[in-house]
Amino acid sequence: MSEENTKLLKSVGLKVTEPRLTILALMQQYREEMQHFSAEDIYKLLLEQSSDIGLATVYRVLNQFEEVGILLRHNFDSNKAVFELNVDHEHDHIICMDCGKVFEFKDPDIERRQREISEQHGMKLATHSLYLYAKCSDISHCDSKDKKD
């Protein structure tokens, strides 16, 4: 993975540094478990690994990764940015308004309709982001540690 990440960083014009490689590998390692990472999430994971990468460096690297397209930034109804690896373009998000949990989903019909609507307005869809805000139908489905006060 490190060799692939080295090639990736070089291909987007970023210098290969240990913090960049470490943060990218960490996001890849935890992608299934945590699809959306805040800078603080990354920093906590780094601390668990006894890394000496500081929070300011984490913010800087995440912003650089976003600028070159490695990451996508989201602000799911909050001022706190979260990032996800830019590996799966065709998905959207449902955010629970009670607990803040984010679910990713794919729907070919929605993707098709977005392209059609763009074309109806004489445009070609380049990218999109769709956030659906909902409430968990079963409150026990909500993750209590994430509940909003």
Swiss-Prot record:
Its main location: cytoplasm. One of its GO terms (biological process) is negative regulation of DNA-templated transcription. Fe cation binds at E90, D92, E111, H128. One of its GO terms (molecular function) is zinc ion binding. Acts as a global negative controlling element, employing Fe(2+) as a cofactor to bind the operator of the repressed genes. Keywords: Cytoplasm, DNA-binding, Iron, Metal-binding, Repressor, Transcription, Transcription regulation, Zinc. InterPro entries: FUR, Fur_C, WH-like_DNA-bd_sf, WH_DNA-bd_sf. Disulfide bonds: none annotated. It is found in: Cytoplasm. Residues 88-149 are annotated as: Dimerization. It comes from Haemophilus ducreyi (strain 35000HP / ATCC 700724). It comes from the Bacteria. GO terms for cellular component: cytosol. Zn(2+) binds at H36, E84, H93, C96, C99, E104. The keyword Transcription applies. Residues 1-87 are annotated as: DNA-binding. Belongs to the Fur family. This is Ferric uptake regulation protein. Homodimer. NCBIfam families: PRK09462.1.
